[in-house]
Regions:
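Acidic, Ser/Thr- and proline-rich intrinsically disordered linker/docking segments
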Residues: 1-23, 46-137
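Polybasic phosphoinositide-binding surfaces of eukaryotic membrane-targeting domains
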Residues: 22-37
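Glycine/serine-rich loop-strand microenvironments at binding/catalytic pocket rims
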Residues: 37-39, 60
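Short, solvent-exposed loop/turn segments at secondary-structure junctions
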Residues: 41-44
Length: 137
C-alpha cells in the first residue's frame, strides 16, 4: 500500500496546558498521501489516531525547510482546507510538520516526490480535459 517513504513528525504543544502536542507520520503512497497523527493523551481523555488521505492533485505545495539551530519543517498546503480541520495548528489548509531527526533525509525526498506526483496528476487531468474537448467537437 505504501512506498518506502515516510516521515515521522512531532509538533510540540501550542497552548499553555500542553494539550495540542501531536505525533504522527506522513506516508507517501502511489496515488495519495496519508497523514496519520495523534494528540497527546490527557488525564481523562484518550485520543484516537486521525487519518487524513490526500490525493496528490489536492496538494498545492510541499516544502522542506532546514535552518541551523531550528526545527526542520515539512510544510504542506492543500486545495481542500476542510480535510485538515482536525489537525491542531492547521491554518486554512496549511500544516507545518516538525520533522524528527531520524526522518530528515526522507523529508527532503518527500517534498521532491510530492512535486513529481503532483506533476503526474496535473498531466493526467490535462489529458482527460483534452480528450473531453475532442469528444465534444
Amino acid at each position: 500500500m505504501y512506498d518506502e517513504l515516510s516521515v515521522s513528525f512531532e509538533n510540540p504543544a501550542t497552548d499553555a496546558m500542553g494539550y495540542q502536542h501531536i505525533q504522527g507520520k506522513l506516508y507517501c503512497g502511489r496515488d495519495w498521501l496519508e497523514l496519520q497523527f495523534k494528540e497527546k493523551d490527557r488525564a481523562f481523555r484518550k485520543s484516537d489516531t486521525n487519518v487524513v488521505r490526500l490525493e496528490y492533485g489536492e496538494v498545492e505545495a510541499a516544502e522542506y525547510i532546514s535552518k541551523w539551530f531550528q526545527p526542520k519543517l515539512l510544510i504542506l498546503q492543500t486545495r481542500s482546507p476542510e480535510k485538515l480541520d482536525e489537525f491542531p495548528g492547521a491554518d486554512v489548509g496549511r500544516v507545518e510538520l516538525q520533522v524528527m531527526r531520524e526522518s530528515t533525509s526522507h523529508a527532503k525526498r518527500v517534498a521532491a516526490l510530492i512535486d513529481y506526483r503532483q506533476s503526474e496528476a496535473f498531466l493526467e487531468e490535462s489529458e482527460e480535459r483534452v480528450e473531453r474537448s475532442r469528444e465534444s467537437e
